[in-house]
């Protein structure tokens, strides 16, 4: 019996970077919640973006944000998994030195830091994704212990550019995962979306077999592998489809919505 449903957003429910979602999702999710199912939004997005996307039912959901590094209710942070300062600052310096074509940002549970308020990444995150942004002169000069994610950005081939040097340099010191063609997300070592879901499973005294997950990209693989029921949308990467127990129609055909309706 399914007691908790968790879904990714970008590429799974909507087009990457969109704040437009089929409104039928809201009514179907609301009915599932009325049946006693816990519904979790589980994305690489910031809380403010997830909150805006699900506005009609936002106070009924639980939120896993920033790729599994923050777990929260609509009003309270339950758990965070911060990065070591030396790690995210070292990553920042390497992108500057080795990947001049790429940009980057550092995230706290409530907002993100970027270094150029006029840059494409700043406008993309603020205007398309609905993120709360802060402009700073130099991210490496920040004195903070609440950085939970460092992300590298390139509009077309971030994973390709990061593969020769950046990923080998850091993949034993942090959890790295491609999140679409534009992003490589970096979390504290061992921290993924499944880490955050495991926290909720323990909190609600559930079993993995009572959990259903939906996803499309590499940062979804752990939760798709470990959940009792899991679906990759058919537009997902081949590795993700292989990790999931089932496949559903692509996001533009509302594949996840069809599966959710079958649970009513």
Predicted features and spans:
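Non-catalytic pre-domain segments flanking phosphatase-related domains
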Residues: 1-7, 30, 34
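Active-site phosphate-binding/coordination module
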Residues: 20-122
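Residue-level signal for inorganic ion chemistry
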Residues: 32, 67, 150, 197, ...
């Amino acid at each position: 019996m399914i007691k908790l449903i968790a879904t990714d957003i970008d590429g799974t429910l909507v087009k990457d970077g969109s704040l437009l979602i089929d409104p039928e999702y809201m009514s179907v999710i609301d009915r599932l919640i009325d049946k006693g199912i816990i519904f979790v939004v589980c994305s690489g997005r910031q809380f403010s973006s997830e909150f805006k996307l699900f506005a009609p039912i936002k106070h009924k959901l639980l939120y896993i944000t920033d790729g599994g590094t923050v777990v929260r209710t609509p009003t309270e942070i339950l758990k965070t998994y911060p990065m070591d300062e030396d790690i995210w600052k070292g990553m920042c310096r390497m992108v500057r030195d080795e990947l001049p074509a790429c940009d980057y940002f550092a995230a706290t549970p409530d907002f993100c830091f970027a270094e150029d308020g006029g840059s494409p990444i700043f406008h993309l995150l603020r205007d398309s994704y609905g993120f709360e942004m802060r402009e700073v002169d130099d991210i490496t000069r920040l004195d903070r212990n609440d950085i939970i994610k460092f992300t590298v950005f390139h509009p077309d081939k971030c994973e390709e550019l990061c593969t020769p040097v950046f990923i080998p340099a850091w993949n034993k010191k942090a959890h790295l995962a491609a999140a679409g063609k534009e992003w490589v997300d970096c979390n504290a070592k061992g921290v993924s979306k499944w880490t955050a879901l495991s926290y909720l499973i323990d909190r609600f005294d559930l079993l993995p077999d009572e959990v259903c997950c939906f996803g499309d990209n590499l940062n979804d693989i752990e939760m798709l592998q470990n959940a009792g029921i899991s679906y990759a949308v058919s537009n997902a990467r081949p590795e993700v489809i292989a990790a999931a127990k089932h496949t559903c129609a692509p996001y533009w055909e509302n594949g996840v919505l069809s599966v959710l309706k079958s649970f009513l």
